[in-house]
Amino acid sequence: MTDEVRRYLRKAEQALDVAEDLLKSGHAPDAAGKIYYAMYYAAQALLKADGGN
């Protein structure tokens, strides 16, 4: 696994952590945005791991 893939996965995990905190405090719309970015970062990691740009 490359450093770039690790960075994207770390960003995805951090976004999910923030989303969880937002949900717990009743901010569902804001959490949805963070979840969107978590999926984006995870997809980027997958593409990079598969050799994509």
What are these regions (language model features)?
Residues 1-53:
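Terminal alpha-helical segments
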